[in-house]
Amino acid sequence: MNSGLTPSPSPAVAAAGPAGVPGSKLKFCRYYAKDRTCFYGDECQFLHDDQLGGIHGNGNSPLSLPGGGPAAVYPQPVTPVGSKKLDLAGLEAQRLAIPGLDGGAIPDTSLTDSYFSTSFIGLNGFGSPGEATYPRMQQRMTNSSSSPSLLNDSAKPYAAHDPLGSPASAMFNDFGGLTMSQRRKTPNPTASEFIPKGGSTSRLSNMSQSSMSAFSQALFSHPSMGGPTGAGLAPGMSLSAGSSPLHSPKITPHTSPAPRRRSHTPNPANYMVPTSASTPVTNSVSQPPSTGEIIQKATVGGTTYFYTDTTPAPLTGMVFPNYHIYPPTAPHIAYMQPKANAPSFFMADELRQELINRHLITMAQIDQADMPGVPAEVDSYHSLFPLEPLPPPNRIKTSNFGYITSCYKAVNSKDDLPYCLRRIHGFRLVNTKCMSLVDTWKKIQHSNIVTLREMFTTKAFGEHSLVFAYDFHAGSETMMSRHFNDPSADAYFTKRKWGQHDGPLPRQHAGLLPESLIWAYIVQLSSALRTIHTAGLACRVMDPTKILITGKTRLRVNCVGIFDVLTYDGSQNNPVALMPQYQQADLISLGKVVLALACNSLAGIQRENLQKAMELVTINYSSDLKNLILYLLTEQNRMRSVNDIMPMIGARFYTQLDAAQMRNDVIEEDLAKEVQNGRLFRLLAKLGTINERPEFQKDPAWSETGDRYLLKLFRDHLFHQVTEAGTPWIDLSHIVSCLNKLDAGVPEKISLISRDEKSVLVVTYSDLKRCFENTFQELVAAANGQL
């Protein structure tokens, strides 16, 4: 035990030994275990729990609190303060002079940290800030590593002199009536754990249930509980929940945020119905919610826990929809939409068309009769589809890799996912040490890099070939085809004949790209280079033909790692020794790409046109863009880093981040429109399997009788509405609303009219839902052979 009373400066108390142990000081032993054993044995000079019972357990005159409640029991006779020794034989007829109980003040030096190591904090034992709080308790709780500080800033400072009837003395009396449990508590992983929510409260532990009840009686009879706080706590022991008890089982509680996020989905309906652990709240929403909190009490492993109900109490004035879940567009999306006639129930046509195109390309296949040169299977890949025109047979090499290359879309038979295969024609791999570089490339995951998945050799194409497998991004196009496919864009840099004058100077929005788009590309390309260089590699493919554009502005660097394999030199001891030089070349290549984008022409990066290209950049773009291009293209004596251009990008990075987040908001809004469509389609599919079924269980009229007849009339109510003039009434919102009401089973009544208009049936949606579920389950049972 680490809590007790500090020794009094009185000589009588200092010299007296409790429970027949002469010379022991009036202070709890720090080494006294719960199994009633002490580290120092009989030679211990401090107070033990069983000795405390010898002092306090023989009195029969309880001290009463000012409120009239029972308190601790102490011996009646009083020993004179001036005596040096206590008569051990007559100890039962004597009472120790404890400072604070006889009107004396409790010295500040006597209030050690060990005094406040019990589980009760504050006057009322639950961290109430309404009465005196000792400074050392604040230090104790602040230095505690097991729980946060539970004190309130409004706590009053400690007064030097406390009378007998003061709150401090009353608290001292309350502690005297406590009996500390001697039962050793061990963790119980199988027990249900009650973890109270955090708040400005205390911890309750190491107490028996009987002592808790005795303490609560004295507690609620105290005058300090007569205020508003006490009125809220007294009726139902409604104590504010505190932090986790000291001896709670050492297992993750079921109320932990992480497991609840994985296993629990909030249900608005639970907020409207009171649970068995709570009572209805009659106050309005504007009233403090603390008055409606219900404190639950449970004992686990001998430890008593108090916790609040985790289910939110029902609040009057809050009504959630029970069937209609199509809210209007969020205002931050509605005001940024350029189109006023945006669809309400479905995603935008532009996004839908883009997704459909990606799906078409992903599922595309070829006719093997028309392309016999494409094998049906390569290694573990099948269903090859060329993504670019196949090279002619007489083609020798390409300007990028020095070999003939071709690109295919294929499906991996191991995971049934589409991949992009880049084939290097006629290459024979003679040194497998380069696989270490390939493994390093496979570990790089970046949003602006096409990830390399594997590399293998094959003869499926009729010759030795090296194949690189990358992630497949359907619908992507190269930067070359997007921005540099216009021959007229090079007119500004072509030489004029004698007597011809230069054409008009290209301008932004009149032949040149917007500067914001160029900065968006710079941010993405520099981010990709930063990740590659940090991994100790070099891109070496910073070229418009190897940069993919997905959507409007999304960039990805393609074909990474190919140069590292094709140019691998096995004679070098360190294969990455030349990487710093390649990284410097990446920065120059990035500068050429940015200059070509600024000129909107590849002719601008030629050496003879550099001066003219920089003049074009100076006239049309900001000085920051010009300085960035000059920095990347100018060779310097020191080693440069891609991080050096970050100050040049500056606040434009935040502009790109803002644009990306706004784009994400628009896509999420489009996704929200499609969330319920799958559910409604399943309802229609089930309804279609029931209606107009020709025969079931040898009954031709099965779909025309019983519950099925109601569903048939409901189908007419959904789709066959007519106006007063007899013309068809087509309203999609009516269909969606009725299906949602059917799925929810609302008690709303509708009238179903037969086709001959001789019968009118008034039913509720809940009745229709019951008929719908029973009928469909009957069909499912028959399909599974259970009927």
UniProtKB/Swiss-Prot annotation:
Protein species of origin: Xenopus tropicalis
Zinc finger extent (C3H1-type): 23-51
Protein name: PAN2-PAN3 deadenylation complex subunit pan3
Domain comment, as recorded: The N-terminal zinc finger binds to poly(A) RNA.
GO cellular component annotations of the record: P-body; PAN complex
Chain's role: Regulatory subunit of the poly(A)-nuclease (PAN) deadenylation complex, one of two cytoplasmic mRNA deadenylases involved in general and miRNA-mediated mRNA turnover. PAN specifically shortens poly(A) tails of RNA and the activity is stimulated by poly(A)-binding protein (PABP). PAN deadenylation is followed by rapid degradation of the shortened mRNA tails by the CCR4-NOT complex.
UniProt superkingdom: Eukaryota
Pfam families assigned to the protein according to its UniProt record, in alphabetical order: Pan3_PK
InterPro entries: Kinase-like_dom_sf, PAN3, Pan3_PK, Prot_kinase_dom, Znf_CCCH, Znf_CCCH_sf
Bias (Low complexity) ranges: 11-20, 143-154, 200-210
UniProt motif (PABPC-interacting motif-2 (PAM-2)) ranges: 185-200
Localisation per UniProt entry: Cytoplasm, P-body
Region annotation Pseudokinase domain: where it falls in the sequence: 365-650
Region (Disordered): 1-20, 131-162, 179-210, 226-291
GO biological process: mRNA processing; nuclear-transcribed mRNA poly(A) tail shortening; positive regulation of cytoplasmic mRNA processing body assembly
Region of interest (Knob domain), residue spans: 690-787
The protein's assembly and partners: Homodimer. Forms a heterotrimer with a catalytic subunit pan2 to form the poly(A)-nuclease (PAN) deadenylation complex. Interacts (via PAM-2 motif) with poly(A)-binding protein pabpc1 (via PABC domain), conferring substrate specificity of the enzyme complex. Interacts with the GW182 family proteins tnrc6a, tnrc6b and tnrc6c.
Coiled coil region boundaries: 651-689
Gene: pan3
GO MF: ATP binding; protein kinase activity; RNA binding; zinc ion binding
UniProt entry keywords in alphabetical sequence: ATP-binding, Coiled coil, Cytoplasm, Metal-binding, mRNA processing, Nucleotide-binding, Zinc, Zinc-finger
